[in-house]
Design a protein with these regions (language model features):
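Glycine-rich phosphate-binding loops of nucleotide-dependent enzymes
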Residues: 1-232
């Protein structure tokens, strides 16, 4: 990345678009603390976290999903979300919860499942789910952390048309108290969900604006749409 500046305000819906290799995921990883930038700074919720690890940023209220599934096929949907709340350490549950706290964590897990419309699968094993349902569970796990900001890395990748519509409805309906930032190749979803769009190319931000401005921008057409991009 080169001279990238991303300023997102509380409650905003922001999409980051660009072809493969544009630097989108690298930018995500720097923000989340999974990668340390060679220069520059990262500020979250008014605090400089440039040298802080990912777990510290998560405690501040940052949650994310990944392009590749990180779910365990042998767990149920409910247990997957539940464990994302109580945490694990050394392969075991981190300290045993008191009954009241355990019930509260279970209810948070179920509420997160309801939010992403996967509650009918709470007892199903993750290994039995479709690709789209995997995405729903991953988002539920992130939401169960009750984040201030949610970052989604290509959530529509590999989804069917119907699953993309379900995802779009889910993201549009998210609590406005949660700041949403998503990387997407699906321009239709990004422009329907986001209020502002950041377009990247070769590690640089080339355009930033509203969905209407992005649709009308000649640079976007020349460097992105004109390079074989096709909405399906």
């Amino acid at each position: 990345m080169d001279a990238v500046n991303l300023d997102v305000v509380h409650g905003e819906r922001r999409a980051i678009l660009g072809p493969n290799g544009a630097g989108k995921t690298t930018l995500f990883n720097v923000i989340c603390g999974d990668v340390t930038a060679s220069s520059g700074s990262v500020e979250l919720f008014g605090e400089d976290v440039t040298r802080r690890p990912a777990r510290y940023r998560a405690k501040l209220g940052l949650a994310r999903t990944y392009q590749q599934s990180r779910l365990f096929n042998g767990l149920t949907v409910e247990d997957s979300i539940y464990l994302s709340i109580v945490g694990v350490e050394g392969g075991r549950l981190r300290p045993v919860l008191l009954p009241g706290r355990d019930r509260a964590a279970r209810e948070r897990a179920r509420e997160a499942a309801r939010t992403v419309a996967i509650s009918h699968k709470l007892g199903a094993l993750v290994g039995s789910l479709s690709h789209g349902e995997h995405r729903q569970v991953a988002i539920a796990m992130a939401l169960a952390a009750e984040p201030k900001a949610l970052m989604l890395d290509e959530p529509a990748s590999g989804l069917s048309r119907g699953e993309r519509q379900l995802l779009t409805d889910l993201l549009v309906g998210l609590d406005r108290a949660i700041t949403l930032i998503l990387i997407e190749h699906d321009m239709d979803i990004a422009l329907r969900v986001a209020e502002r769009v950041t377009m990247m190319h070769d590690g640089r931000v080339i355009v930033e604006g509203t969905p209407a401005e992005i649709r009308a921008n000649e640079t976007v057409h020349d460097l992105y749409l004109g390079r074989g991009y096709r909405n399906e």
